[in-house]
């Protein structure tokens, strides 16, 4: 078995994987340090059945397209396929209240490729907790939101890194005896070491090291 960190294990997924993120955030908030659902939602019975009644703080980073025609940004109380589900504003407000967050910083990423699929970030925090709730919205559809202005995979990694507890100590202790299994790029494809690229080094003890090798 992999020797996963007891304080720095994270979960991310898109669409149905995003719904799984929220389910685990409700049912296993003490197992995972933070969650990053992409184009996900919560079904109403997930709240009315009180599976999110735990007071355990939960760090959440949702990315969602305002033009998503599969999992509508505003939710759908009349969906006949999966069943009614909540809108993103309702979900984010739930987690903000859950974590007792009081501060909000809003920022707009430069639209570098002029495609008007502008990404806006909403970051909620508080001085009394290390947990945060982030929301990135973009004018695209049911996808990761990689529109050329933002690399969502890197933003998720930055979020997880910021939410990490004692990360540097954990990495230092484990890399001394771990064996490298493979190297992958940000899309999960196997890769050889190359310069000026973000790569992830995966070790046999379950740890992952992020590297950028400059010329």
What name fits each language-model region?
Residues 1-16, 26-31:
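Gly/Ser-rich "nucleophile elbow"/oxyanion-hole loop immediately N-terminal to the catalytic nucleophile
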Residues 20-24:
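Hydrolases whose catalytic domains are alpha/beta-hydrolase-1, hotdog thioesterase
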Residues 30-42, 58-59:
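A conserved short beta-strand
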Residues 60-63, 86, 96-167:
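C-terminal catalytic histidine-bearing segment of alpha/beta-hydrolase fold enzymes
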Residues 66-69, 76, 139-141:
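Acidic beta-to-alpha connecting loop that harbors the catalytic carboxylate
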Residues 104, 162-190:
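Residue-level detector of functionally pivotal "anchor" positions at catalytic/ligand-binding pockets or at interdomain
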Residues 198-215:
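C-terminal tail/sorting-segment detector
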